[in-house]
Structure formats: structure tokens, C-alpha cells
Amino acid sequence: MKERELRDLIAEVKTGRLSRRAFVQRMIAVGLTAPMVGMMLAQSGVPMQAAEIPYKPTKAGGGGHLKILYWQAVTLLNPHFAVGTKDQDGARIFYEPLAGWDAEGNLVPVLAAEIPSKENNGLTEDGLSVVWKLKQGVKWHDGKPFTADDVVFNWEYARTPETAAVSIASYKDIKVEKIDDFTVSVKFAKPTPFWADAFVGTYGMIIPKHLFADYIGGKSRDAPNNLKPVGTGPYVFDDFKPGDIARGKINPNYHLPNRPYFDSIEIKGGGDAVSAARAVLQTGEYDYGWNMQVEDEILQKLEASGKGKVLITETGNIEFIMLNSTDPTVEVDGERSSIKTKHPLFSDPAVRQAINVLIDRASMEKFIYGRTANATPNFLNAPEKVRSKNNKFEFNIERANSILEAAGWKKGSDGIRAKDGKQLKFVYQTSINAPRQKCQAIVKQACQKAGIDVELKSVVASVFFSSDTANPDTYTHFYCDAQMYNTTMVQPDAGFFMNQYVSWQAATKENKWQGRNVSRWQSKEYDDIFKQAEQELDAVKRSAMYIKLNDLVVADNYIQPLLRRPKVAATAANLRVPVSGWDNDLWMISAWYRET
């Protein structure tokens, strides 16, 4: 679609000749996501129109106890340190952002009084600033007022390198100023097409200045409230046992009328995905089960009982294998997997290329995941307009053998290939989960036929995805040769998702392994294109840049995409849950209720 045609359509929306819904549908047809269309319209002077969240209760409380099951247990409750989805969701019960993303990709105000637009003077033509007006009368759980000072503090807290916040990328390149007690200005150093990053969604949850001001920087991990949250959310902290359970009780002073419905809430951790699915769909012991990474055949049988249902929500999430670009066995200055080292096996491109064609993605989809995943050769899969058409996956054991043979990796008497005195054997880890162990087995079996010895390692999910920086078995430490997990796309723009491979995001001891580039893979070309994409206002050019970034990552084979995975949750038949593929599962926990 040409720029002139696009501008004409936007003009028709402004005058009312074309409905907003019809415009969104046209843009989705050419590859844009609904959230990106909403941002485009807002920048053009057409405010976002979030649909009202369905909510029937006429008073707060009275709903009893809400039981949520996360088979990966919550380990901390500070959103700025939450490297895993389960810790992000745990924090979302107590903390809130200025706005969240609904299912249609519209911004929904939470702590904001309204969504910035040109009509309310919140957005500028040049894309260099945004003005947020805050909701008045909101109180922290300890009774202190929520003000612009808290918003400015969160910017200072997250952007300080010594704080080692996983959210630093959203805050380090902006400037936030207090205009008055309930208004803040966010200023960008360069034109920014996707302005709804800081203070929005997953990395937008706001913590109170009066409790964290003394813990900015190097003392950040010492704050008592890292484990005892005092937020603005619908539930007040009650109890927390890291790695086990988090409990909350109704906030009697919540800033939305008639909410929340439930008197108390718990997120119980532990077990596995199958037992979690059974506890919701079959026995009804729990109301909601997160991340049903279970064979689809099992889910369908459990769902047939009628006590619950499976919710499938499309996302940009990707299950993938990551090959370590560094050496996990060598310690440099007290740090393993240091960016100063190279992996002894994977530094050979032929080895990475061979592994790529030894992965039977089609079988993983067909025999394990079914309707809950789709095989893909791309790391970046959403929105459709940035999904590369340049790649395809292949399963070919014969080709893998030929690649290795040509590169000088010869089979020994034990059947394992070797070169320059190094055997082709490595350790491949993931979290304990039946589908993941089956995927591991598929890869191991194929590798054996190519003369590669693969040792499988499984780590308890609550440990593997822990945000504890002292835990050496987390996926962010990556003290292993290869690992597999699912990374989530927590906003509709590709920028934050693709910063997982910029050099300045490498996970290191210095940043307490909070950097998003866990593989430590580095490319100057990638860095340069990423910087260009950050400030490119032309949507078509920007999309082409993200496709190029995807292709660079995929071509180097340190990253092996496997499956596009939607969100899959289990819920009680009478539980009403606003879902969104662009935000966390608990993004609108205040609106959950039971149909009676």
C-alpha cells in the first residue's frame, strides 16, 4: 500500500466516511497488527478506542477466593527484576502500569487518566515527546498518594545501570520530567514511532518512590519490598513464599469502582503443566492454569469433562533453541560464558548449520503441540508484515552428515565425530516439561545419526526461569552449550523483541545477568540496522529492517527457531477473563469475575 493511499484512508476515518473497524481490518490484511494500526491512527490524530472491558459485578468483593496455578513458581515480586513471565505476572497482582494492551491492540488506561493523543495534546507531530496525564486519587497500599514523582522515580531507577533492571532498555534513552503532580512528559532523543513502551504493559509497572528511593543503584537487590510489594493494584500483599505461593487480599481503596470481585487471590507454583491442566479442567481444584504447555491430545481429553475450557490467544511468542556463542566451561574474571570467549564447537559455522537441519520441527508440531504451536524458520513471526518470507526449515540427516564431513568432522570408532582433538558432543538443557523433553529427544535422536553426542539436561522450571541472580542454573546465566525455551513478545512492536540480539544487551556478571541478549551473539551489522529501525518513522522501511534483523539472526544459526506458540491457558467454565496476546495473562486481573 502506497503512502498516499494510506493517508487518504486515514482521512476517511477522521471524517467518518470509513469506520475505524473497517480501516483496522484493511491494515491487518496487509500485515499490520491491530496495536500498530491503533498507534498509527493516534499519531494521525485519531484517538484509540478501546472497547469497554466486560464486567458485571455491581460491588467490590463477595467473590470468594481466586485460585491460580502457575507450574513455574513465582520467585520475586519486583517487576523491574522479573526476567521470566511468571515473575512478571506475580508482580501484576500488586503493581500497575500507566496503561496496558487489550485483545484488539488498543491501549487501556490504568494509572493514566487518558491515553495520549493529538486531540488531548499528548502526542507531537515530530514523534519526540509524549505527555501522560495521571489518574488522581490513587493511593499506594500503605495509604500514600500516587503522583508524578513516582513515575519519574521509576525512570531514574530503571535507567541506572547499577540497578541492573531487566527493564532498562525501555528507559535508558528517554528523559522523563514532572510537569505537575499528575502530569509527566516523556522526551525521546530521536523520532520514536513506537512511543508506548516506557510505563506501559509488562515493563511499565510502577513501584513506589517512598519505599525504593534508598535502593536505587547497587543496593537494589537489598530492598525489603522486593518480596513484600506495596502497589496500587486490586490486591494488597498478604503472604509470599518464593518458589511456592503468593497471596493477596482485596484492596478496599482500589481506584476503580466495584472492583475487584474476589476477596482474596493466590498464585500457587509447582508441579507440571499436565497436573496444572488437570487441576483446572478435570478436578476443578483451581480456577485458572497458566501456560498449558501440554500435548494437545491430553488437553482435548481433559476439556471434554466440561468443568473448564482452554483459551488459545495468538501471540508473537517463539519456542527456540539457543546455541551458546561463548564457552560455558571457561571462567574469565570470575564469569563463565564470558563474551571474551568463543564456544569450542559452535564457533564452527558448519556445526551450527548441521544442527539446524537435524531439527524435525514438523514432527514437533504434528505429534506434540497440535493446535497449540506452528513450526517456523523465523525468530520474528508477528506482526505478519515483519515475518520474513526468505527462510524455510528442513529436516535432512543425510545433508547434516555431508556438511560435517566436508568441514573435517570425522567419525571415530565410537561413532562420534571429532576434529582437532575435540569430540562433537554437547549439553542441551531446558526446563522440566513433557513436551520439551519430547522435543529434546527428537533432536538427540537425529544428532546421534549424524555423529553428534547430545547430553540432555532438565532443570526445574522455577529454577530455570528464576530471577535470582545468585542462581547459576537460570537460563540467563546460560552455563550450558545449548538451551531451549519460549520467549514472549510482550508488546505489538518488534523493537523490544528484537533487542535480544544487540551487543549492549549481552547478559553478563556486570549487569547481574539481566541483559536480554542471553546468547551473547554479537554482530555490528545487526547493531547498526537496529539503531536505524529505532528511529525510522516510515512503517514500510521499518518493517524491512526488522525482516533483515530476523534474517541475520537465523542465517548465523546460533538461534534455531522451532515453533510459534500462542498463549494457552486453562480456565474454569464460569470464570470470565479478559485475554490479550499483547500483554501478560493477568494484565486486567481487576476485571476477573465468576458468572453466577
Describe each PLM feature range.
Residues 72-91, 111, 166, 195-205, ...:
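A structural "hinge/loop" feature
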Residues 39-71:
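C-terminal segment of N-terminal export signals and the immediately downstream linker at the start
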Residues 562:
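Active-site-proximal polar cores
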